[in-house]
Amino acid sequence: MGDAPKKVGLTVRRYVPEEGFKESAYTVAADRFTTVLDALIHVKEKEDSTLSMRYSCRMGICGSCAMVVNGKPSLACETNLLSLGTDKVTVGPMEAHPLLRDLVTDFDDFFEKHRSVMPWLVRKDEKEKFRPEAEYRQTSREVDYYLPFSYCIKCGLCVDACPVSNVNASYAGPQALAQAYRYNSDSRDQGEKERLEKLDTLDGAWGCEFLGACSVVCPKGVDPALAIQLLKLDLMKHSLTGKTSASKAVR
């Protein structure tokens, strides 16, 4: 038989448009499987239907339920309630993103910054993809260069953890910068020069202070902090030599 459910006090910091924050307190029963998202869904369905939050897959794939749990940017669906080691849990929205209501944030700016780094394969021959004989072949070593940075689920936790993103709304942010490096390091891509020229600014790669918080909170083990430092290295190579594919040339 399993252990009896434990009572946990759940405080939700809710953003109310034109009013600011208010706190709502609830008590939920939690067993060893209960996640923070489970608790919030229970509150929404059984206690307070006015609570607004965003979620979808419930299994750490979509990134929709990103929020701040006991001060740490986290996915609610991957945060076990009892593993927090306290009977008082506080959740709130990610404040580095524009706030909409309660725990829901606006990701328009986030995705605009993501799009700005051209997160797709750029090829000089635009008709190439329409030729059936065309293939983008890669060795396993070439895949290894970018694969660790390709697991991003666009949850926005890294941006919320970033001290620069919290004070400079113009900063590209760790998610976008890491994805820029992911595509620059892909041997199939030919858009490195354009990306480097876009990000050679204080609002781009040089704005990173290398605190590393972005990498600590990433639920998928992506290392945005490392990607940004490698991006800086590529920027220096490009500035000194004018070459844009030095890292690809050695593969």
Residues covered by each model-derived region:
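Short, contiguous acidic and Ser/Thr-rich linear segments
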Residues: 24-35
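Glycine-rich phosphate/adenylate-binding loop and adjacent beta-alpha elements
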Residues: 69-91
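Charged, amphipathic alpha-helical segments
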Residues: 1, 45-55
